[in-house]
Amino acid sequence: MRTLQYLLGALFTLGAPAAFAADSTITISGYVRDNACAVAGESKDFTVDLQDNAAKQFYAVGATTPPVPFRIVLSPCGTSVTAVKVGFTGVADSINTSLLKLDAGASAAAGMGVEILDQQQSRLPVNAPSSTMTWTTLTSGQTNILNFYARLMATQVPVTAGHVNATAIFTLEFQ
């Protein structure tokens, strides 16, 4: 009987440590990098003037006007910023969804859309998902200028002469 009491006592003793609680601390740490840039005042709200263009130059679907340069100035940039993705969102043209749709109205042009191009003059489709955008290298701690172009492109012929207006919003994703 005494042996049974010792065995039961030993078993209860082995199970006892699981019943005790100990104070412990988990430390979680990290670092928030200064890896963003501010959009300079001149780039917050601006207009790109596509100039006056003759309707006859839109002789075929895909015909374009000369590209007009514009830029987005990022200043100041953080000391850890390395790159940025720039996307443009807006109402897409119903015929060519890579283009911005022209605003409608009584004196509005029709049959064309606005194409946005990167600094190499390659098309940047509107409303493109972030995963399809390329990273542009930035210089940390300095002002960075991102160059783009805009132009009109015929989506149908003949085009209707009139006022050209379209609106795009740009988004920035920093690395």
Model regions and ranges:
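Mature extracellular/passenger domains of Gram-negative fimbrial/pilin and adhesin proteins
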Residues: R2-L4, F20-Q175
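Sec-dependent signal peptide hydrophobic core
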Residues: L4-F12
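N-terminal signal peptide c-region/cleavage motif recognized by signal peptidases
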Residues: A16-P17
